[in-house]
């Protein structure tokens, strides 16, 4: 099957305007930068056709969040709770996603490039045409994800958890890890290089001589 690449956000000169967190708000055609909304909670926030740059939302909780055709650039979303969110045609570029929780979210046509996502959780997510490239995904969670057209390129995957995730057709070869958690019954069809195969085998308790 030919690999598809995510559709990047198509933004036509978003208007610089105020951005803030408030329940039931929808922002469309917006550009905002250099704002801090950490330690807040917001429900049913919607972003469309928007660019957010250097926005900080540490330990913020966004419930039932929805965004489409959005660029997040140089943002700090460390420990942000994005549970059960919806992300369509979204690009995270050079963002800090340390401990960010995407659990149970739906992501389609999403790109993560040059992000620091150590301890981030994508557990129980639905990923369709999603690309991670040059990201730090150390100790990240990809537990029991449902994926189609997932691409991983030059990421650091040491300590990442892929338990109960079917891996048939997933290509790890350009990524690096010295330990990784996989379910043996779901490893059929996983594409790895020789060094990675030895690392995985050692993790399963095999003694290689």
Map each language-model feature to its residues.
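Tandem repeat scaffolds
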Residues: 3-209
């Amino acid at each position: 099957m030919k690999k598809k690449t995510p559709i990047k956000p198509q933004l036509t000169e978003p208007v610089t305007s105020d951005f803030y967190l408030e329940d039931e708000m929808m922002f469309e055609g917006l550009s905002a930068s250099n704002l801090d909304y950490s330690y807040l909670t917001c429900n049913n926030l919607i972003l469309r056709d928007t660019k957010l740059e250097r926005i900080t939302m540490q330990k913020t909780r966004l419930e039932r969040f929805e965004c489409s055709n959005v660029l997040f650039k140089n943002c700090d979303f460390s420990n942000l709770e994005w549970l059960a969110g919806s992300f369509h045609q979204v690009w995270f570029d050079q963002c800090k996603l340390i401990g960010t929780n995407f659990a149970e979210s739906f992501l389609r046509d999403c790109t993560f490039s040059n992000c620091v996502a150590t301890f981030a959780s994508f557990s129980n997510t639905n990923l369709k045409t999603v690309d991670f490239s040059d990201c730090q995904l150390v100790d990240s969670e990809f537990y029991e994800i449902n994926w189609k057209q997932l691409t991983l390129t030059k990421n650091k995957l040491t300590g990442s958890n892929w338990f109960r995730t079917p891996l048939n057709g997933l290509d790890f070869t350009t990524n690096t890890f010295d330990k990784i958690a996989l379910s043996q019954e779901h490893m059929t069809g996983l594409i790895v290089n020789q060094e990675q195969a030895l690392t995985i085998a050692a993790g399963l308790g095999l003694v290689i001589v």
